[in-house]
Amino acid sequence: MQLPSSTKILVVGGGPAGSTAATLLAREGFEVTLVEKAIFPRYHIGESLLISVQPIIDLLGAREAVEAHGFQRKKGVLWEWGGERWLFDWKKLRYDYTFHVKREEFDEILLRNAQKNGVKVFEGIDISRLEFDGERPVAAKWSKSSTGESGTIQFEFLLDASGRAGLMATQYLRSRMFMKAFQNVATWGYWKGATIPEVEVEGPITVGSIPYGWIWGIPLRDQTMSVGLVIHQELFKEKRATQSVEEIYHEGLKASPLFQDVVLKGATLEPQIRTETDYSYISRTLAGPGFFLVGDSGAFIDPLLSSGVHLAMHSALLAAASVKSIIAGEVDMASATEFYQRCYQGHFLRWALIVASFYEVNARKETYFWTAQQLAHEELGVFNMSQADMKDVFATMVSGVVDLGDAQNAGRLQKGAERVHQYLDDDGREEDVTALLQKSKQRIFEYLDRVKNRDSRAAMQRYKAGGTETFSMGLDADGAVGGLYVTTEPRLGLLRKVVEERAEAATEAPAPAAPPPAVAEV
């Protein structure tokens, strides 16, 4: 199949963000072309999925293929953190499990699913340059190294899912902002014969802190375990002056009794050890005229809570719904891009707050690693958000994780967010962002204490009956941003909250009197 000279929608990148957005838009009847630099399957880190991806797997129609592949099921999380042990499980949620995956296999399933849904997929294609009409990208220069072919493809909409390479953010917008917090380095390898700790849940990811970092253990389906060490970049550089990467890795593992004496006892390390920087960043511009940055192209957050694929697939859903409604004339370009920008910023900030709060549990150890992870007031400037939007993030983040542990409907969610707003701003005036941040963290610490004390209602994340995160933005009427939110039924797109409110009012109004019986004509 020849790469076309033009397409309605061009998606750059075939990872979960690109394949999700492409599939959703192709199913709406649009011409979608996806180009990917690599040839799939290709290796990628980020193997532990959150439950929040499960509804999107269903939405994509990929459930059967994912289940049939036999990925290791993940029904919880085991933490040894700050000298304490916590076990999270999801027994009472709509989806009580998710997966640990080999990303080369999972990502290919999603990409082939995109092809089945009508997406034109081209692998081994490198995009070297974009052409613009004003601020709007309209064409891409491409080449295929395996054949020497090259050309130009024109498009109306660009979804940049190019990952950390960040086609738009790094080459044209130059808008990528790195956070001072979470500037870490990950080193990992794969072990045969590792032991999953014996706990009450199946296949948990195991996370353990050490004095100067933390370790993950992700069980994969072929009796292999991914085990990684995360330390601050400055310490990594310091150690590299006298130690090899392998020595740094093994020294870190030995600092954790959980991994040294339980998980890796009797296990064998495969030869290759990999290293990658985990610098967290977000683009100041995430959408604009005719373009959207999705997944890692727009933002990347510290891997502590395994949020990478979650952010990729959720941002893809937000972007696909926005593009569909623009094309259909349901929402204007400016409103849709503002909606996407604010939603993705909000999703990212919530994860940053939660990660910072977990790191702060260990801050009392007063090592450079733990103090370096703290999200300070000036750090929040990276998000380029209004104080009102930031306050909404704090309120809904805290209410979703803590205050509404038993929430099962949108009404309770809304009331919970209102209660937290009152808590954060109980004197009726705008507070300092630092104070809001600290109060949000305080509530998370209270939540962690509940988990530690085995409160039966406590869980790592709470989901509504529909399976969506309780603290998501833009994914239901109660999370509307700028009056807009995503709908997938009966068709994908953006709805205005006011429309739904009017519909509800009409439903609640007294029914009109029945008309008199018709009189038959004779």
From Swiss-Prot:
Taxonomic superkingdom: Bacteria
Annotated gene: cmdE
Binding site for FAD: 17, 36, 42, 44-45, 48, 103, 127, 296, 309
UniProt-listed Gene3D superfamilies: 3.30.9.100, FAD/NAD(P)-binding domain
A GO BP annotation: toxin biosynthetic process
UniProt miscellaneous comment: Chondramides are secondary metabolites with antifungal and cytotoxic activity. They are non-ribosomally produced depsipeptides consisting of a polyketide chain and 3 amino acids (alanine, N-methyltryptophan and beta-tyrosine or alpha-methoxy-beta-tyrosine).
Keywords, comma-separated and alphabetical: Chloride, FAD, Flavoprotein, Monooxygenase, Nucleotide-binding, Oxidoreductase
Classification via Pfam families: Trp_halogenase
Similarity annotation: Belongs to the flavin-dependent halogenase family.
Functional summary from the UniProt entry: Involved in the incorporation of a chlorinated tryptophan residue into halogenated forms of the secondary metabolites called chondramides.
Descriptive protein name: Tryptophan 2-halogenase
Species of provenance: Chondromyces crocatus
EC number: 1.14.14.-
